[in-house]
């Protein structure tokens, strides 16, 4: 029976009569009553809700002609009652009727509810295929919504739902149907930021990878991201070989650019696997070239790619840039050294760290050379950190590492003169080769076998961890574990960290289980803390896979392991801004009974939210006023991590309250955070820079300031001017991936709270900021590009000026009153004699004096007016852009303003996002004009300008340390 809906708009004020009609036996009367109820349901629902079961019975009666209408009425009643699940259930039973309802709020609410249920049920079905199948009515509604989006080309709306619902079939359909060039990178971004399920993410990345590779011109750089996250070295190797074997320059340059991207973002184990899969230069060459010299073999495309993946090429250009543009203000360092008592080990270490950070990668050790007497005051662990500082200063000098450290390394069959220097030298070796230890790890492992001294073992273990970072080398892991089982507190703490570094990001259950078991067995807190940090490193980036161990650590009775649980959470969910994890960490930060755990919890927020610093700022805004100083310290560090290099005024405003805190270590953390935020900033970028720098100096010079605050100020001076003012703290690579070494470096650096030598790990987070353009032969041609912004905005901060010596003014001699009277009488007598002479001379003299006095202010006014006009012209003539050359500093904030000459000889193979950039040569038939690279020879003095640096290397020197007592 076909029913016609009434258009009668008469007002009904009560539902009693209509509800009575529902009890009639006549179907027509029931349908009529139901139509009227539906027509006025928005007003009558309170009365109807009491007898809604009556209408439900009508829906369940299969013989009732308007079952769908009954379901729709029941749905709207439940909607008004706030029972949305029941409302949706009956709405789906009403067929398409609810989609045509005139109440837009009702319709939109239930559509959103449909989508939410579709996502929930689909994701559940993906994880458990045996679960109840998806309701066809629900999928029909959602499919209808999708079809409308398809018709309007609103693909992204559907993609968001499909990714959350784990529907790979829908994603694949859209990727094949749509030809938008930016859709696949969008899905890739969602996969890396939204998807937490590792297994689904990998399947999605596989789908993306195949989709990218089927394109006529694939986005190889997005492909590179996929293979790194999939840890698929074979695909990467095949791709590099395919591109490098093609005859056109663009493909070859793309291969090199992809190799640089992989080197920047992939773990060491992945890079080693790719290099092993690539043909060696000798194999790639033909048989007649087999006897050619190694230099010729290295010039093959595969040879170049292997050198790039090994890190050799990147550090070669980085050290050239850091050497040539070293802008360290040594006067700041010398003033700090003079203000702090050298015999206090805290202050000696602080100056050592500041010097290492300021000269990171520059090879400039002039501060040590010029202050040998100060250096000789180091003792015990101060010797260790001072020797290890050479590793920070000479970071990346792989080929010269042994020569630099030979004076401090043990000689065969010779007694050790200083175990602290030896341990520091091995630590320095690791810092030089951090994350690129393929050639030195075996040497360190052999040394570990032949030493039993805990201090030397400590340096060796840290060095092995640094060189074997993310290598997943089981043999190396077992060697370190042997030292752990000796149960020595000092060496054992380093062993725990080293084991975590070697197995970084593997989530190895075997490694975690045995480390956790030993942590429960040992009585040494140092070892427990080292193992805890090691476990946190193992679950780096694993997200949901790490939930089990995180829960176990967070529920442990030992506060040291709960402390480790916070860092495990931070590293597992680093950069995700996961709201559930943030809530859990915040709860622990205010509820745990241990101050160390609470401090670590707040610090963890910085790692979790560093991709969304504004969210972090709003999260910790209340925590900076906490009654607990450890929470306040953690808030400062979290701000420093999340807002590093951003110059965020909101973060600096919060920190300005903490630098005046009553607790010394809170002030320490606040100053370190300020420095992290303001790296590579000047007064033009942020007006607070000079004031903050001055505050650091005031804290250091203040005689009665607390030692911990002075330590923080000194570290801050080193961080804000790190790498000769040419590096920044970067937790992401140029392509947007997590920067493994930087995140690990900051994590271990924060353990300086317990052990000062770990402060050197901060250097792992430093990234040089330069535009380094290379041609197809990996040479650096001379070419220019434009920075479309005022030069002053991104200029180096001005260097300090040595104050000029003040001239000593003589104090006027006191004169007795009797002497004054005698002198007055003598003057009167002289005037009486002079009055007899001519008055002409007097007039001339007076006139001349008057003229001079009148002329002077006029001249000064003229000079002032000239100065004003000159200054005014200079302001008007300040250029709005500048032309820069290859190997020039380009800070991250400057990147949006960089442009290239479209008609120039060289243009980039892709958009510049920082770091190394491959250049296509439009005039490849002409010989290029190359920049001469000379950094493999000479360490430079920081006080000399790049053009004034001498060609001859400085004489070798050795630290003036006495033998250990």
Swiss-Prot record:
Keywords: Phosphoprotein, Proteasome, Repeat. Residues 827-856, 874-883 have a biased composition (Basic and acidic residues). Residues 826-883, 934-965 are annotated as: Disordered. GO terms for biological process: proteasome-mediated ubiquitin-dependent protein catabolic process; regulation of protein catabolic process. Belongs to the proteasome subunit S1 family. Transmembrane segments: none annotated. This is 26S proteasome regulatory subunit rpn2. The keyword Repeat applies. GO terms for cellular component: cytosol; nucleus; proteasome regulatory particle, base subcomplex; proteasome storage granule. The gene is rpn2. One of its GO terms (molecular function) is enzyme regulator activity. InterPro entries: 26S_Psome_Rpn2 (IPR016642), ARM-like (IPR011989), ARM-type_fold (IPR016024), Proteasome/cyclosome_rpt (IPR002015), PSMD1_RPN2_N (IPR048570), RPN2_C (IPR040623). PC repeats lie at residues 385-418, 424-457, 459-493, 494-528, 530-563, 564-599, 600-632, 634-668, 669-699, 712-744. It comes from Schizosaccharomyces pombe (strain 972 / ATCC 24843). Pfam families: HEAT_2, PC_rep, RPN2_C, RPN2_N. The modification Phosphoserine is found at residue 952. Residues 945-965 have a biased composition (Acidic residues). Acts as a regulatory subunit of the 26S proteasome which is involved in the ATP-dependent degradation of ubiquitinated proteins.
């Amino acid at each position: 029976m076909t029913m016609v809906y009434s258009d009668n708009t008469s007002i009904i004020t009560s539902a009693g009569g209509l509800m009575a009609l529902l009890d009639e036996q006549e179907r027509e009367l029931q349908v009529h009553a139901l139509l009227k109820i539906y027509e006025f349901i928005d007003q009558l629902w309170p009365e109807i809700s009491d007898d809604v079961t009556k209408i439900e019975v009508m829906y369940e009666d299969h013989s009732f002609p308007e079952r769908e209408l009954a379901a729709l009425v029941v749905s709207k009643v439940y909607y008004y009652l706030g029972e949305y699940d029941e409302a949706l259930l009956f709405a789906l039973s009403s067929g398409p009727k609810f989609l045509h309802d005139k109440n837009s709020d009702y319709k939109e609410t239930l559509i959103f509810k449909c989508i939410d249920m579709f996502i929930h049920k689909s994701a559940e079905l993906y994880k458990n295929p045996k679960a109840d199948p998806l309701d066809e009515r629900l999928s029909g509604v959602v499919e209808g919504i999708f079809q409308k989006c398809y018709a309007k080309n609103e693909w992204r709306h559907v993609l968001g739902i499909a990714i959350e619902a784990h529907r790979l079939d829908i994603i694949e359909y859209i990727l094949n149907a749509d030809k938008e060039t930016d859709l696949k990178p969008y899905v890739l971004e969602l996969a890396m930021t939204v998807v937490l399920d590792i297994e689904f993410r990998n399947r999605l990345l596989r789908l993306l990878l195949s989709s990218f590779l089927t394109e006529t011109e694939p986005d190889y750089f997005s492909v590179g991201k996929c293979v790194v996250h999939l840890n698929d070295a074979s695909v990467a190797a095949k791709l590099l070989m395919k591109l490098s074997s093609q005859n056109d320059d663009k493909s070859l340059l793309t291969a090199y650019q992809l190799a640089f991207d992989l080197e920047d973002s992939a773990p060491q184990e992945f890079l080693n696997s790719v290099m092993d899969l690539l043909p060696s230069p000798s194999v790639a060459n033909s048989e007649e070239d087999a006897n050619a010299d190694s230099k010729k073999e290295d010039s093959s495309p595969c040879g170049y790619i292997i050198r790039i993946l090994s890190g050799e090429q990147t550090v070669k250009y980085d050290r050239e840039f850091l050497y040539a543009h070293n802008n360290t203000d040594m006067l700041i360092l010398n003033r700090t050294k003079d203000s702090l008592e050298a015999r206090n080990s805290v202050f000696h270490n602080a100056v050592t760290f500041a010097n290492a950070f300021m000269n990171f990668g520059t090879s400039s050790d002039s501060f040590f050379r010029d202050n040998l007497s100060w250096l000789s005051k180091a003792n015990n662990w101060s010797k260790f950190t001072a020797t290890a500082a050479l590793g920070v200063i000479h970071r990346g000098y792989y080929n010269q590492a042994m020569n630099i450290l030979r004076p401090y390394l043990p000689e065969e069959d010779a007694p050790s003169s200083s175990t602290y220097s030896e341990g520091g030298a091995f630590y320095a070796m690791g810092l030089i080769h951090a994350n690129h230890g393929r050639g030195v790890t075996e040497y360190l492992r052999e040394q570990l076998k032949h030493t039993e001294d805990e201090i030397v073992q400590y340096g060796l273990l840290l060095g092995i961890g640094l060189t074997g970072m993310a290598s997943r080398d089981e043999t190396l892991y077992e060697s370190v574990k042997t030292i752990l089982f000796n149960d020595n507190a000092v060496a054992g703490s380093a062993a725990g960290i080293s084991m975590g570094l070697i197995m970084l990001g593997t989530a190895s259950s075997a490694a975690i289980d045995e480390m956790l078991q030993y942590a429960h067995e040992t009585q040494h807190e140092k070892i427990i803390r080292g193992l805890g940090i090691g476990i946190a490193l193992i679950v780096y980036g694993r997200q949901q896979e790490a939930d089990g161990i995180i829960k176990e650590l967070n529920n442990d009775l030992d506060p040291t392991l709960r402390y480790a649980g916070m860092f495990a959470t931070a590293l597992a969910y680093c950069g995700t801004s996961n709201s559930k994890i943030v809530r859990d960490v915040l709860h622990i930060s205010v509820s745990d009974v241990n101050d160390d755990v609470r401090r670590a919890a707040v610090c963890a927020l910085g790692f979790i939210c560093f991709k969304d610093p504004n969210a972090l700022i709003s999260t910790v805004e209340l925590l900076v006023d906490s009654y607990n100083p450890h929470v306040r310290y953690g808030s400062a560090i979290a701000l420093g991590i999340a807002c590093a290099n951003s110059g965020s005024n909101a973060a600096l405003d919060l920190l300005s309250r903490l630098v005046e805190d009553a607790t010394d270590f809170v002030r320490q953390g606040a100053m370190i955070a300020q420095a992290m935020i303001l790296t590579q900033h000047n007064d033009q970028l942020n007006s607070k820079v000079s004031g903050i720098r001055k505050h650091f100096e005031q804290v250091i010079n203040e005689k009665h300031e607390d030692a911990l605050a002075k330590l923080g100020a000194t570290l801050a001076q080193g961080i804000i001017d790190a790498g000769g003012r040419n590096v920044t703290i970067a937790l992401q690579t140029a392509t947007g991936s997590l920067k493994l070494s930087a995140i690990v470096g900051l994590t271990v650096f924060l353990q300086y709270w317990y052990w000062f030598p770990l402060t050197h790990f901060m250097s792992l987070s430093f990234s040089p900021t330069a535009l380094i353009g290379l041609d197809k032969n990996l040479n650096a041609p001379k070419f220019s590009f434009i920075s479309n912004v005022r030069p002053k905005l991104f200029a180096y901060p001005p260097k300090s000026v040595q104050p000029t010596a003040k001239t000593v003014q003589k104090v006027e001699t006191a004169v007795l009153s009797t002497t004054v009277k005698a002198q007055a009488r003598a003057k009167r007598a002289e005037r009486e004699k002079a009055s007899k002479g001519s008055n002409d001379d007097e007039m001339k003299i007076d006139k001349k004096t008057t003229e001079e006095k009148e002329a002077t202010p006029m001249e000064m006014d003229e000079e002032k007016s000239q100065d004003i006009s000159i200054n005014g012209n200079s302001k008007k003539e300040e250029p709005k852009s500048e032309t820069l050359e290859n190997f020039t500093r380009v800070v991250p904030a400057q990147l949006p303003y960089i442009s290239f000459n479209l008609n120039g000889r060289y243009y980039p193979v892709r958009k510049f996002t920082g770091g190394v950039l491959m250049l296509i040569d439009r005039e490849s038939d002409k010989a290029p004009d190359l920049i001469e690279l000379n950094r493999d020879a000479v360490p430079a003095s920081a006080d000399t300008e790049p053009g004034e640096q001498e060609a001859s290397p400085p004489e070798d020197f050795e630290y003036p340390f006495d033998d250990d007592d």
